[in-house]
A protein has these predicted regions:
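N-terminal prepro-regions of secreted/extracellular proteins
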Residues: 1-43
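Post-signal peptide N-terminal regions of Sec-secreted extracellular proteins
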Residues: 28-130
Length: 130
């Protein structure tokens, strides 16, 4: 009798395990848009599908919005929005290596080479769109 209960329990457990493994999990949607903090003076986003940034100056102070970026493999650069505050964002297109990360943050500058002001917290994004 005890052996029969043990076999029944084992078969039930095995059946449950097969059911769980056969069902699988739903595919996860990949994230393709990574944006910085919404309260920043300059808004910045990275779009992993297309490898581009957008940067938008949100403060009417005569200064420009700047997005600074650096990949985990050493490449770096900047994207500038000098078309005035509250206008459509500036798009900067790049071609990055897939499967890496990019760190970016935004700032406000007086001219292209001015000192960074109002530097946002850094954001990290997957270049591969995971």
């Amino acid at each position: 009798m005890a052996a029969r209960k043990m076999i029944t329990a084992s078969v039930t457990a095995a059946t449950a395990l097969v059911a769980v493994l056969a069902t699988g999990t739903p595919a996860q949607a990949k994230t393709t848009k990574f944006c910085g903090p919404p309260a920043a003076f300059t808004l910045g986003c990275f779009y992993s599908e297309g490898d581009y940034f957008t940067v938008q100056d949100m403060r009417a102070d005569g200064k420009r919005g700047v997005l600074k970026w650096q990949t985990d493999y050493g490449r770096k650069g900047e994207c500038h929005d000098a078309n005035g505050a509250n206008n459509p964002p500036t798009k900067c297109d790049y071609d990055f290596k897939e499967g890496h990360t990019v760190l970016f943050q935004t700032a406000v500058r007086n001219g292209a080479n001015g000192a960074d002001e109002g530097l946002s917290n850094p954001m990290i994004a997957w270049i591969s769109g995971r």
